[in-house]
């Protein structure tokens, strides 16, 4: 073959992109000159995680490849260019820009959201949920809206409802059927789901057929239902199912299914052998597959067809596990049990914990045919393995869905899985594939992921993959090294446990007993501050005590942050950001006297920069005399509790956010932790304190406080997640006590709560079980520990300035009183700064 | 490189502090000089000292690691207080430790490690801090400079 063939792919969605990757990775570009047309502005992105667009991810981070991927691979990508016609006679595709010849053509046009033919469905603010542009439109429409309705209570509908709720709209879901998620759950499961979702404040209206949409009175729209009941809302999102985008194929006469979809065979060939179809537009064996994993398998089959391989598409498993509005829902195989007449079912319903589980098993009770889970997905992975690998069920199949405490419920350990067990269904990676990459030299999780792509699709298999990889590495005698540094063969968490259990109070004791013998046992700048922090969390002795001082980072040693020229900053605590005029004046006077640059921080306090080492004790002496205390701006510890002005002044406020912020700041000040901790408290849902970007965020409600956890600003912002609702003051303190102590206990060094949470096996659900339901039985202990820290608080600066021994370090030179002469300042905008 | 950077800064310092400088310049440039006492040191950590040498004044970081030399000396170290990476005089305020068998100090600003023995930077083989001889005479700490 002397000339390249022209291969055109229509659609740059998830599946079309996967096909491009197959072509690039397997050297097919020598044979094909590939051109991809994408109607959307953006290059292919992760539609499965589309909703994360609302929680801080942008188009670039959702993209499935780097910006230059297509260009460097030699594939032409034409975004914002829709194909409007396929001319099969001349073998050309037509766009507004021109005509392009093809030898082979692949349709990967996906599907579009179905909008029911209701009069008024095209009004402004009637939207759908499929693309990034759709989400931009929703966000724009939500700006001046207070209520939103989702039409359709299926999987995507509930996801859209969650998004509206996240945009602070009062949200309702309107479903035509008699239960939510009619495809995935039965009546009992649907009922439970409704209860849970209503408890989150989303209104659920079942058996409602919308007749028309017209002008509303109080809101922008009014929806009129079959029985003339009405619902008013400012914004409507239709999520009433998807339809294949098969218009191009229809127009050029390809075979189309009765209810839509381009008919394909096992090779993904359409009725014209020059044309293939893959993904959600393709109809195989009378079925459309509305999930990404089957689409990827089709892409692999299509690649094989284009290169004369023999991989075929043979249908796909539609098992799914999701978290919708924070509610677990899982569905495996024949979840309704209506495809196997002889199937038998086990059901378990816990009306208190609101969990429902159902097993569908073969008549001999040996094989799992399907399963349905609502409220708790913890057994999903195990059940899926039984199902997809045909593993024989235990004698008492019911034990698989009974609560853990009532016995049995053995999870299938990674060792028990057969080689053929599918671990990652998105990329079709089996346990055998993983073993092979390890045998070929992969030494850790990252290596396995890079080699197999496992867990880089929907991410649902992350925990399972990790356990398989760890298990296989250990089976091969590879020590999975989690040591903190060369001085200790322990993780931070293990060191923490050792310190607590053995009551070790100094670094010297710890390294004598548990350090590695082949070092000088001096420690280093990794383990010393980490151990210092652990000791402080456990015993709360002043960090400047003789036994602890050599462990501290310079910032902790001098209880101030070292700046780039060797001077320090001074940050007194201003709890909740509330400060009297008298104290403000003192800050000004001190700053003036010691020539300090002054700046208001984002933590609602005042930072004084440029203090010389030898001036620090005098500066603090004056501040302490005026009633200030240290702000721990230097420590891995509580920084500030930011607050809005709240109900005392604000006309919207429903609780006293400033009062609460001061309470919290005073309670947790001085707590040493794996990394810094920031709080925010807002007085109502308008959230002026931006509490959802904090480790601990608190938002007032009519009835108390909603608690959010594990948020973060910075390089990788992360919205805090709703953890508990309508707590009273006492409950709030208790929950935060437990949460913080559990974090202090289990996090790695320098791991913020957000990263800790992302790495926590079991995620938020697990955290809730531990903190709210006391599943580990440690809550009393956590509360006690926190109370000890609270009770033993003392201002480190007050402690230091009353101890001449401690003050002796606060001079530039041991043998000379002069200040460091090489610190040179210059002036800018009326203040000093380093020259 | 370190030497010249330090020298230049000291020239500026001289101008700024000419009075103080004169006081010290009148001292004799003896080989060994007393800088402080044992009580001024902080075990397993550092302090800074001002030193007048034949080449002009220097800021020296002195580290005290009791027990490290197992009685054979080797428990006092003196090196540049000046951190060549940040150009600030801060080395004495770094964390002391041992890495790959050698006692080191980590710069408190950008965290590079310097070997106490010879001042060698572990992250950049082109960078080396100056070192001075240092010893106890009874309870006094003496540096050769
Ligand atoms: C909110 C949301 C959540 C989801 N969650 C999950 C989940 O948890 N798990 C799961 O498995 N699946 C999920 N899905 C489904 C999954 O995203 C789809 O199965 C998958 O994206 C299908 O890939 P595709 O390439 O077939 O279609 P798409 O990704 O839709 O790509 C088709 C592309 O073709 C373009 N196109 C169409 N016509 C033309 C034309 N004429 N010319 C040029 N370009 C054209 C379209 O603009 C589009 O970009 C979710 C979908 C949504 C919307
Ligand atoms: C890796 C990233 C970051 C580092 C290393 C860092 C470091 C620091 C340091 C050292 C200080 C104290 C300044 C001083 O007093 O000398 C500080 C203060 C502060 N930082 Fe950051 N910071 C980081 C990211 C952030 C982010 C992302 C935010 C906001 C979203 C933030 C908000 C603040 C605020 C509000 C203060 C002042 C707090 C106070 O009043 O004590 N920081 N930061
Ligand atoms: S969050 Fe609410 S209470 Fe607080 S300032 Fe904003 S509007 Fe007022």
Feature map (PLM): residue ranges:
Chain B
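N-terminal pre-ligand scaffold of iron-sulfur
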Residues: 2-102, 115-116, 128-145
